[in-house]
A protein has these predicted regions:
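Typically the conserved alpha-helix immediately C-terminal to a functionally engaged Cys/Sec
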Residues: 60-78
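Structural alpha/beta surface segment adjacent to cysteine/selenocysteine redox centers
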Residues: 86-113
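Positively charged n-region of N-terminal signal peptides that target proteins for export
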Residues: 1-7
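Non-catalytic, surface beta->alpha helical segment in thiol-disulfide oxidoreductase systems
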Residues: 66-68, 108-153
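Short active-site neighborhood of thiol/selenol oxidoreductases, capturing the structured segment around
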Residues: 44-58, 83
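A short beta-strand-turn-helix
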Residues: 30-48, 77
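Sec/Tat signal peptide C-region and signal peptidase I cleavage site
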Residues: 19-25
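Bacterial N-terminal signal peptides
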Residues: 10-19
Length: 164
């Protein structure tokens, strides 16, 4: 009986250790507020990805789970971008280019009327584009690469997306 208990303890310890090691390798997106992201982007010389969502939006939840939860996407965001989230239906302000906006006003200023939407900004805070709707992880990774590697400066999205 003692041998069985020892075997069970060794197996349990091995499973626990393996689980902790796997969990340590998972990259999670470290989300900022929009205002924090604009400040940090200037200091770190990184572009910004702003996820605009609402609590009731099913596609927003799916984007969180499948796209932002994808290890490659999360790693790319962590390495190349300052990632921010904003819910325009919640209280809060966004400081952007010397002006203060409510979160709803900022979403409206970006032309966002549906959720989810993803806004991309350059290192100085200039808006690059807004992508409406849910985006699959592989497609989102293409967009992340397109902006992170500054391909957008020399190649249109149409040309780039045909190559990949």
């Amino acid at each position: 009986m003692k041998a069985m208990n020892r075997i069970a303890m060794v197996i349990a310890g091995t499973v626990l250790t393996a689980g902790l090691l796997l969990a340590a390798n998972v990259t999670e997106v470290k989300w900022k507020t929009a205002s924090e992201a604009f400040t940090e982007a200037k200091a770190s010389n990184k572009k910004i990805v702003l996820d605009v969502y609402t609590d009731w939006c099913g596609w927003c939840k799916r984007m969180d789970k499948s796209t932002y939860g994808n290890a490659d996407v999360a790693e790319s965001l962590e390495k190349n971008y300052v990632a921010a989230k904003m819910n325009p239906e919640k209280e809060g302000t966004v400081q952007y280019q010397g002006k203060n906006y409510t979160q709803a006003e900022f979403a409206q200023a970006l032309g966002i009327s549906g959720y989810p939407a993803t806004a991309f900004f350059d290192e100085s805070g200039e808006l690059l584009t807004v992508i409406p709707g849910f985006v699959q992880p592989a497609d989102f990774q293409k967009v992340l690469t397109y902006f992170a590697e500054n391909i957008h400066k020399t190649t249109t999205w149409e040309e780039y997306s045909k190559k990949k």
